[in-house]
A protein has these predicted regions:
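Hydrophobic H-region at the start of alpha-helical membrane spans
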Residues: 1, 37-41, 144
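Juxtamembrane helix-loop-helix connectors linking adjacent transmembrane helices
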Residues: 12-91, 108-109, 186
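Alpha-helical transmembrane segments of multi-pass membrane proteins
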Residues: 2-14
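Transmembrane helix-loop-helix hairpins at the membrane interface
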Residues: 75-186
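Hydrophobic/aromatic residues in alpha-helical transmembrane segments
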Residues: 5, 48-52, 102, 151-152
Length: 186
């Protein structure tokens, strides 16, 4: 459904679907480099935010709260070797919709890229947070999603393609799932 809605959104904005996969030829920096830097930036900012949260509220049990998020909990039921497939696929689809369809459709109809970034980030954070059960989950998932969306919009706007943000988001999701200690308990 998000793919169909994204395609329709791009059609309404008169942005060719294939265009969101085309790297701007005038780009002076490698999209691969930007993908890696977006991933590193997203992870670094998420870890920084988590450490600030733990400094403010040391008794906040972030790992157990995050492991109880429904999609993370269900991902942990798969063997570790294949558990990465679900977050990887979801991240790619989310990027196609939020940074690909929404961001490029908004900028395609003349909305200022920074306003488009703010709107897309609010939409993305809401999409992530409505799936959680408590405040700790909402704060941690919300803050990480905010950083990921801002970086993704920035890179998509800079490169003219959704591919670097898609790669960064997919690696980000897989990184956090693969580094989850809960697999050791299974």
């Amino acid at each position: 459904m998000p793919m169909l809605f994204g395609w329709l959104l791009l059609r309404i904005a008169h942005v060719p679907y294939a265009e969101i996969f085309t790297v701007d030829e005038a780009l002076q920096i490698s999209p691969v480099y930007l993908s890696v830097m977006s991933f590193v930036g997203g992870v670094t900012l998420s870890i920084l935010a988590t450490n600030i949260m733990l400094t403010i509220a040391p008794k906040m049990d972030i790992p157990n709260n995050i492991n109880k998020v429904a999609w993370i909990e269900s991902t942990m039921e798969f063997p570790k070797q294949i558990a990465w497939i679900f977050p990887f696929s979801s991240a790619c689809i989310e990027e196609l919709f939020f940074r690909g369809a929404c961001f490029f459709a908004f900028t395609g109809v003349g909305i200022n890229p920074y306003i488009a970034m703010i709107v897309v980030t609010i939409m993305f954070v809401f999409n992530q947070v409505y799936l959680v059960d408590n405040k700790v989950q909402a704060i941690v998932i919300g803050v990480g999603s905010m950083f990921l969306s801002i970086l993704g919009c920035f890179v998509a706007g800079l490169t003219g393609t959704v591919i670097p943000s898609m790669i960064a988001h997919a690696i980000y999701a897989v990184f956090f799932i693969r580094s989850n200690d809960s697999f050791d308990a299974v």
